[in-house]
Amino acid sequence: MKNAEIIAKLNLEQKCALLSGAGTFTTRGCPKAGVPSITLSDGPNGVRKQAGAADHLGLNPSVPATCFPTAATVACSWDPALGEEIGRAMGEEAAAQEVAVLLGPGLNTKRSPLCGRNFEYFSEDPYLSGKMAAAYVRGIQSEGIAACPKHFAVNSQELRRMASDSVLDERTLRELYLTGFEIVVKEAAPKTIMSSYNLVNGTYANENAHLLQDILRSDWGFSGAVVTDWGGSNDHALGVKNGSTLEMPAPGGDAVRELLAAVQSGKITEADVDARLDELLTLVLDTSAAVQKHSRSFDADAHHALARRAAAESAVLLKNDGGILPLAAGARVAVIGDFAETPRYQGAGSSAVNSIKVDTLLDCLAQSGLQCAGFAAGFDRQGRPDAAQKAQAVALAQKADTVLLCLGLDEIKESEGLDRVDMKLADNQIELLQAVEQANPNTVVVLNAGASLETPWLAHCRALVYGALGGQAGAGAMVDVLTGKVNPGGKLAETWANAYEQTPAKDNFAGAGRTVQYREGLYVGYRYYQTAGVPVAFPFGYGLSYTSFAYSDLKVTADSVTLTVTNTGARDGAEIVQVYIAKPGAEIFRPAQELKAFARVPLAAGESRTVMLPLDDKAFRYWNTRTDGWEIEGGRYEVRVGASSADIRLTADVDIRGTNATDPYAGKALPHYKSGSVQNVPDAEWEALLGHPIPQDKVRIDRNMTLGELNHSRSPLGWLIWAVLTALLNASFKKGKPDLNVLFQYNMPLRALAKMTSGAISMGMVDGLVMELQGFWIIGLVRVIYEAVKNQLLNAQLERRLRND
């Protein structure tokens, strides 16, 4: 152990105490043993350190910081070097604010476009997600503090996120949901990783030995600290035994007593506690030393400029009929849309940054050389019809050469704690677009949203620019793109389906109960659409430019792909070269093709460049459930190089030596998985892939019952709590602004009451409440009162001992 000398100075109670937080974002310290307390902070696209009363949802104000574009935005740059720059800037700001651990980036696979937190995640593809996340981690940790990639693992929804069970086969787990994390661990060596709230195949992620020990620590060699998501610990002792280091936020004395009792009963050993403590001490001592040495200032203007460049390089030009963009200098433009005045530039929840400053499109246009004919809001942000606003916008559109129409999703559509109900743009925005286009066909739509949308309205605009959620400088970046100061080079990091009904997980996403069946298996995003032959609106990797590019001279080996890329247009630009691997006629079923390498290549007009893209150990492998390892199917593979997953420019074959492993699916009838048509996989085939019966879903009145399930309790108290929460939730929907506190409570299991209240509520009190909800009113009430008195006495005694030791 690295910290054996310090550990030897501590008694068992002190050791156990250090393995849980002291406050919402602080760890416990032990000054007599030389152990300082450190501060952790959100978030993935900027620092959210709260100066006063702290909460994990972003409800209370935080210290001003740079709000960079969200991960979903920067992923469209396909530029790890840019991600590393952003990470370095965030690390610098975190250290300046005395934050030792920055809780990000998030790299959960975008299983469905409806996940309300997709704006925080990079991509539907694990290779792209992993490469971008690794870059962020390297940047953050270059400042001496710790990055904390999250949420490990298979955490793809917000509904019942603290109690849902993600059920999937081992191959899908390894190839699709863990590969991104594997890349981060092996290429960036994060000092911490955050475990997810959910269960994975029946066991909570934070106490899942298969995830934390077998895979994370043994297979990948991770030696850092695993931190729970806030309130995400189910069984603290099992977590410690199976590889979880630090329980957050502040469970109080109950967590300490739980570990002490577990050691005394033999459930865990003191050696287990020491192993976790060694990981924690390494984190605390290394990062606290770095923070102490760091400057307490940073260059806010330089970071704003970086945020603007990042947003500009990530913007995706989806349509440009007749080359209407870029706009000519002096063009007279009408600016329409509420988002031009009040931008949507980040998502809601724990990632929300108190931005140092925020650009608006109106302000930035005034400095662009364009003439502004005027501004009209045009629509109500929350979707309510407003004929007067629409009429004003139509009248303005007639007075301009070009209309800049700013559309997008409002705050209630994309938030932590809440999944989207559809992929649609609000009706009032679509109606406005149709009316404006009739008044002025030269309509350019600027779209702000953190995830994909249905676009049946696409014919009503001449150009469409996707700015995603561009951060505090996103509006300035958009003006740079619209005017041609920046040539858009971004490409989509997720497929845009024609309709939600055509997405692979449409019948299984979020689940009807606690059990969430990942029946689609490997076929997520482009892996599904291209294998099953389903047309899409915009394919994965798609994006236009103000110039054009040619591909030539392809050379392929088992280790690399080399080609020449030429800018054949009149403008400087950047092309994102994408390499996909396919195996026609494969014996082991697999997607039609998979991304295995990419590079962003800047080129001056007329310039040619030779590009070499390495193929790593992930290029040809698959997970074999019979050998329980990575294998390679031997034979001829096709290497496809293109400008998107659907725009393949060059191909070449390469022969690869296989490992001659046994077919893991021999004797199994899996027609839907072999064809990729996985929307309606029958139970028998799903069970054959899983290797066991489908888990039965049943709401149980226990510690893990969520407050949103209390209508199933046997108690008027439970029904009342559920009714009040539901009413508050519906009220926030009507206001168009998510009530994050209510959303969290609605999806929160009862056990979290003991994990999120700084020791005020013990698990014994929760058990008494459960008895009440089961219908045992008197016994339950007596238990709650008894446990409350006991908890207060024990907490006071513990704190006295810890202060005196």
Region annotations inferred by a language model:
Residues 1-622, 636-641, 645, 720, ...:
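Glycoside hydrolase catalytic-domain context in secreted enzymes
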Residues 693-805:
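Long, compositionally biased, glycine/small-hydrophobic-enriched stretches that function as flexible linkers
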Residues 645, 652-724:
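Charged, amphipathic alpha-helical linkers/stalks
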Residues 617-664:
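Terminal connector regions
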Residues 46, 367, 484, 502, ...:
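A generic signature of intrinsically disordered, low-complexity regions enriched in glycine/proline
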